Amino acid sequence: METTEGLLAKVNDIESKLPKLESSINNLRKENEMLRVELNKINENLQDIMALYEVVSNQINPFIGVSKITATSLEKLERLETEYKRLKKTVEELTNDLIILGSLYLHQLDINLDEIIEEVLEEEIIKSMSGEDTHDTKDNK
């Protein structure tokens, strides 16, 4: 009898613990699924990082040749530098041509630029000393 009563008590004890165990198992399954999702996200992020690493290392790695992207960029940069030098030279030549043409024009018309500058400066000095202001907005409506 005792053994039967003891066994019944143990069965009742197990039956009372069974819902708690089922609840714990369900919680563990949910946590396991959440961990699986997080691991998948980590795996995807790691794959993205590795792809980025490969792109960067292919462009910068000194142990491999110049990548196609870097070579193309260097080519474009060299072309831009050549074009810049050409344009700079052209601007310098045009500036020199303007100076020469301006000098010829002034010489042909017998214009003394130094005298003109001197006259304008004298006029401005006289105006400023007399109190006239050529930049006064009230008088220049």
UniProtKB/Swiss-Prot annotation:
Cellular location(s): Archaeal flagellum
Keywords: Archaeal flagellum
GO cellular component: archaeal-type flagellum
Protein name: Putative flagella-related protein C
Family to which this protein belongs: To M.voltae FlaC.
Any Pfam family: FlaC_arch
Coiled-coil annotated spans: none
